[in-house]
A protein has these predicted regions:
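Extracytoplasmic beta-strand/coil segments of soluble accessory domains associated
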Residues: 74-109
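Outer-membrane beta-barrel translocator/receptor signature
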Residues: 139-146, 154-204, 229-232
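Short acidic/polar hinge/loop motifs at secondary-structure boundaries
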Residues: 107-133
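N-terminal periplasmic accessory domains that precede
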Residues: 28-31, 40, 73-76, 114-116, ...
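Short, acidic, small-residue-rich periplasmic hinge/interaction motif at the N-terminus
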Residues: 21-63, 87, 95-97
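C-terminal beta-signal and adjacent terminal beta-strands/loops
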Residues: 623-691
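Face-selective signature of the C-terminal outer-membrane beta-barrel domain
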Residues: 187, 231-257, 275-426, 431-437, ...
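Outer-membrane beta-barrel signature, preferentially recognizing the C-terminal barrel domain
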Residues: 448-497, 501-503, 519-533, 538-541, ...
Length: 691
C-alpha cells in the first residue's frame, strides 16, 4: 500500500518530463476549461485564475478550489502553490514566517486566533487571495503576507451553508457550523458560527543521558496526554456601501473555550507523575473600518482576551513525593488604530502614506499553593504595557510593460516596560513585465518579531517531575531582513531565490541542566538564524482528469548562538523539500486528491531532526446539483509527518519521539442553499496571547 501511494505521488514527476506546452498555456498561470456545445461545434474557453501585479500573486480562490477537496478558507489557502499547512499553521516556501490578514486591515487577534476564524469560513465568501513576499506598508504587516479579500455587497442575494464533521485521531469527535449571508446593492450582513468538540491523544517517549556532577544519569520516560474541550467561534459582520468608492464595515468575533481539561501521565525509571489541568478562556474582537472616495482608509480594532487555569501536579521523583497546586491566568486588552491615504497621480504614479498605533495591556499571574517536596517554585504576578507607533510613506509607479516598482520607508517607536526603541524598515518591490511569458519580481523587506507576553515572564512551570518551562524576562525582539527574486515563466512555472537574515532570533529549545537533574524548556535569543535557497513551483495537467502542483526547494541553514547556556553553537546544514499536490477528476462531481511532502533531515539549534514524509488523501463527492458535498480526508497516512528529535552536542545527549497518533480521519458533509442574485452592482475597489 505504501509503495503504491508513493508511486502515485511520483507519477507526475515522471510524466512532466514528457509533457509539451501549448501556446494557450501561456494565457494564465493556472486555468480551468469550460466547454460550450453549439450544434456539433465545441468551443473551449479559459479564464485566468492567477495574475502577477505590483509584486503580488493574485489567486482566484473560488476557481482554484472547484476541484480541490477543501471545506473552508484555511484549507483552500493551504492548497495554493508554495503554501503549506502543518500543525494548524500556514507557511510560505522561501519565508521563515508569513502573516495572514483579512481585507488588508490589521487585527489585534493572534495568527492562531485568526486561523481558527478562517477554518469556520466558507470558501465562497472570498473574492481572491494576495500572496506577497514583501507586503506594502499600507497592510501594516511586514515581510511575507497572505491577504484574504472577502466579498463586498453588490447584488441581491441570500446564501448559506450548513456543515457537520466527524473526526477521529485516536478519539472520535465532532464539529458543526453554519454561515449565512444577506446582501443588497447597498449593504451586506454575514453571520458565522462553529462549534468544535476537540479530543486529542498525545504520546511521546524520551531517553535522556543527563550529565550532572561528572556523572551520566540514564533517564527514560514515556508520557500519555489526553485533552478534551469545546471551542466555539462566532462572527457577525456588516458593511454598507456609502457610494461606489466609499464603504463602512464592522465586525464582531468571539472565540470561547468554556471548559478545557487535560491529563498527562508520565512513567519512567527516574520519576512518575500525573498532571491534571483545567482551563477556560474567551476572546472578544470588534473591528470598524471606513473607506472614503478620495483615498482615505481608517480602521480601529479592539481585542479583549481572558483565561484562567488550574493545575495539580503529583510526582514521585527518585522516591521523593512532590505535589504542586498551580493557579494562573492572563488578561489582555489590545487596541489598534490606523489611517492610510492614497493619491493617484499623473502618469500612473501612486503615493501612499499612513500611521498606526497599537496599545496593549497584559496582566499575568501564576501562584503555587499546597507545595510538598523539594521542587523549585516561583510565583508570578506582572503587568506589562506595550505601545507601538508606526508611520510610513510609499511611492509606486506602474507601466503597462517593462518595470513597475514600489518603494517605501517605515518608522516605528516601540515601548514595553522600560524598553524604548526606534526602528527603521525599508521595503522595495520591482516587477518587470515584458511579455506574458516572462515576469520578474524582486522584493526587499524588513520586519521585527516580538515574543509573546507569557514568554517574557520570569516564571517556572513544571510539566512533570523532570521537565519544566522557564520564562525569559530579558528576551529581545527579532529583526529579520529578507530578499526574494522570483521569475515566472509562461505564467505557469515560478523560480524563486531567497535570502533571509534573522538577527536576535528566538525560539524555545530543550537543555539538560548542569545544576540539577531537570530538562529545561526555555525561549532564548540567538545571534542569528540565516537561510538561503531556491524554490521551484511547476503545475502540470493531463487532459481534464489529472492536475498536479509540484514543488522542489533546496535550503541552507546557518544558526549561531554564543550565549546558549554553557554550550555555544555555530551550525549549518543543507536540506531539501519535495511536494506534490495531485487531483484526479473521476467525474465532474467526484474528485480524488493525493498530496505528499518529503523533507530531508534538518537542524534547529543543537537539535538534529530526522526526515519526515507527510502523505494525505481525500475524496469529495458533490451531488444534489452541487448543493451537497461529502468529503472524506485521511491525513498523515503513514504517521510520519513529524520528525524525531535527537541531540548529541557537547554534554547534551537525548532522544525524543513525538510522532505517535498523528494520523487522522475526517468526514465532512456540507449543504449550501440560496444563491438568488439580482442585477449586478458596480464592485467596490478592494485593492500574541495564551499560557
Amino acid at each position: 500500500m505504501k509503495k503504491l501511494i508513493i508511486l502515485c505521488l511520483l507519477m507526475p514527476l515522471c510524466s512532466v518530463m514528457q509533457a509539451t506546452v501549448s501556446d494557450s498555456d501561456s494565457i494564465a498561470l493556472m486555468r480551468i476549461y469550460k466547454e460550450a456545445t453549439i450544434g456539433e461545434i465545441v468551443v473551449k474557453g479559459s479564464r485566468p485564475l492567477v495574475k502577477v501585479e505590483n509584486g503580488m500573486l493574485h489567486y482566484n480562490l473560488n476557481a482554484l478550489s472547484e476541484k480541490k477537496n477543501v471545506s473552508n478558507v484555511f484549507e483552500a489557502i493551504a492548497s495554493l502553490p508554495g503554501i503549506m499547512e502543518k500543525d494548524g499553521a500556514l507557511s510560505l516556501n522561501g519565508a521563515s514566517s508569513v502573516s495572514v490578514i483579512l481585507d488588508g486591515r490589521p487585527t489585534t487577534m493572534t495568527q492562531e486566533q485568526l486561523n481558527t476564524l478562517l477554518k469556520s469560513m466558507s470558501v465562497d465568501r472570498v473574492v481572491n487571495v494576495e500572496v506577497m513576499y514583501s507586503a506594502p506598508p499600507r497592510y501594516h504587516v511586514r515581510g511575507a503576507a497572505i491577504n484574504i479579500v472577502t466579498k463586498r455587497a453588490g447584488v441581491y442575494s441570500f446564501q448559506g451553508e450548513l456543515k457537520a464533521v466527524y473526526q477521529n485521531q485516536y478519539f472520535s469527535s465532532c464539529e458543526g457550523g453554519a454561515n449565512f449571508r444577506v446582501s443588497t446593492p447597498k449593504m451586506a450582513f454575514d453571520l458565522m458560527y462553529d462549534a468544535d468538540d476537540v479530543k486529542t491523544m498525545q504520546h511521546y517517549t524520551m531517553d535522556s543521558h543527563h550529565t550532572y556532577q561528572n556523572k551520566v544519569y540514564d533517564i527514560s520516560q514515556s508520557a500519555w496526554g489526553r485533552y478534551k474541550g469545546w471551542n466555539h467561534s462566532l462572527r457577525a459582520a456588516y458593511e454598507y456601501n456609502i457610494s461606489d468608492k466609499s464603504l463602512f464595515s464592522m465586525a464582531y468575533t468571539t472565540l470561547l473555550s468554556p471548559s478545557d481539561n487535560s491529563v498527562n501521565d508520565v512513567t519512567g525509571n527516574y520519576q512518575t507523575s500525573r498532571l491534571d489541568k483545567y482551563m477556560r478562556s474567551y476572546l472578544h474582537n470588534v473591528s470598524v473600518a471606513f473607506q472614503l472616495a478620495f483615498g482615505l482608509k481608517m480602521s480601529a480594532d479592539y481585542t479583549n482576551y481572558h483565561s484562567v487555569n488550574s493545575q495539580l501536579l503529583q510526582s514521585d521523583v527518585n522516591e521523593e513525593d512532590n505535589q504542586l497546586q498551580i493557579n494562573g491566568g492572563q488578561d489582555v486588552r489590545k487596541i489598534s488604530l490606523s489611517a492610510d491615504q492614497t493619491h493617484s497621480l499623473r502618469h500612473d504614479w501612486t503615493l501612499d502614506y499612513g500611521i498606526s498605533y497599537v496599545n496593549a495591556y497584559d496582566k499575568d499571574n501564576q501562584y503555587y499553593t499546597d507545595v510538598k517536596g523539594s521542587m523549585p517554585t516561583a510565583d508570578t504576578d506582572t503587568r506589562l504595557t506595550e505601545q507601538s507607533t508606526d508611520f510610513y510613506v510609499s511611492c509606486d509607479k506602474t507601466y503597462k510593460s517593462g518595470p513597475s516598482f514600489s518603494l517605501s520607508a517605515s518608522g516605528e517607536y516601540y515601548t514595553i516596560g522600560n524598553y524604548h526603541k526606534w526602528a527603521f524598515y525599508p521595503q522595495a518591490s520591482v516587477t518587470y513585465f515584458k511579455t506574458p511569458k516572462h515576469v520578474f519580481i524582486l522584493s526587499l523587506s524588513s520586519d521585527k518579531t516580538y515574543p509573546s507576553y507569557w514568554q517574557m515572564q520570569s516564571s517556572v512551570t513544571h510539566l512533570d517531575g523532570y521537565q519544566e518551562i522557564r520564562g525569559s524576562s530579558h528576551l529581545r525582539p527579532c529583526s529579520t531582513y529578507s530578499l526574494n527574486a522570483t521569475y515566472a515563466f509562461n505564467r505557469k512555472y515560478t523560480f524563486s531565490l531567497f535570502y533571509e537574515d534573522a538577527e536576535d532570533y528566538f525560539t524555545q529549545s530543550m537543555y539538560q541542566s548542569s545544576e540539577r537533574l531537570a530538562l529545561i524548556f526555555q525561549t532564548r535569543n540567538w545571534n542569528y538564524s540565516r537561510q538561503y535557497g531556491l524554490v521551484i513551483n511547476a503545475p502540470f495537467s493531463i487532459g481534464t482528469w489529472f492536475n498536479t502542483q509540484l514543488m522542489a526547494m533546496g535550503l541552507h541553514q546557518h544558526e549561531k548562538c554564543a550565549d546558549y547556556f554553557d554550550i555555544p553553537f555555530d551550525r549549518n546544514k543543507w536540506l531539501y523539500q519535495l511536494s506534490a499536490k495531485n487531483t484526479f477528476s473521476v467525474s465532474p462531481h467526484f474528485n480524488i486528491q493525493l498530496d505528499g511532502m518529503y523533507t530531508s533531515p534538518l537542524i534547529q539549534g543543537t537539535y538534529d531532526l530526522t526526515h519526515l514524509l507527510d502523505v494525505d488523501a481525500s475524496v469529495k463527492w458533490r451531488f444534489c446539483k452541487d448543493k451537497c458535498a461529502l468529503t472524506v480526508r485521511l491525513q498523515d497516512i503513514f504517521n510520519s509527518g513529524l520528525p524525531k528529535t535527537k541531540v548529541n552536542y557537547a554534554n547534551q545527549k537525548f532522544d525524543m519521539n513525538t510522532t505517535y497518533y498523528q494520523r487522522s480521519l475526517s468526514i465532512t458533509f456540507s449543504y449550501r442553499f440560496g444563491g438568488y442574485k439580482g442585477k449586478e452592482h458596480k464592485e467596490i475597489d478592494t485593492s500574541r496571547f495564551g499560557h
